[in-house]
Amino acid sequence: MGNYELAIGYSLIFWPRFIVIDDYVLRAGSTVEALRNFEEATGGDRRATEAVMNHIHIADIHTSGAEPSEAQVRYLGRLMKETLTAKLKAEFPDRSFVVRFTDEPGLDITDYELTFWQQV
């Protein structure tokens, strides 16, 4: 079985926390400095800035042990997309978001990513 520390860790993956900086909705832990760097890198494109700052690689959830299979990563990615969509809707009912999971078969295992950005 697991333990309480693992349960709390998984809760933060499947039901993440957010912060708002300059009207960007970002995963908790994001900084103003990182935001400014990504704004510069994206030429001020708000959608691209949010998308890159909010993306996660599903295969990076666990960094030790056996590499996950494509089926495992795609299953978790789909589930995380559903929970992320629900969390954003619950926490920001007045905003619209695009939540995207790269769910194509045959990708490199590290290319399965989940991200979100505000739809304007």
Predicted regions and their residues:
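An N-terminal amphipathic alpha-helical segment
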Residues: M1-E70
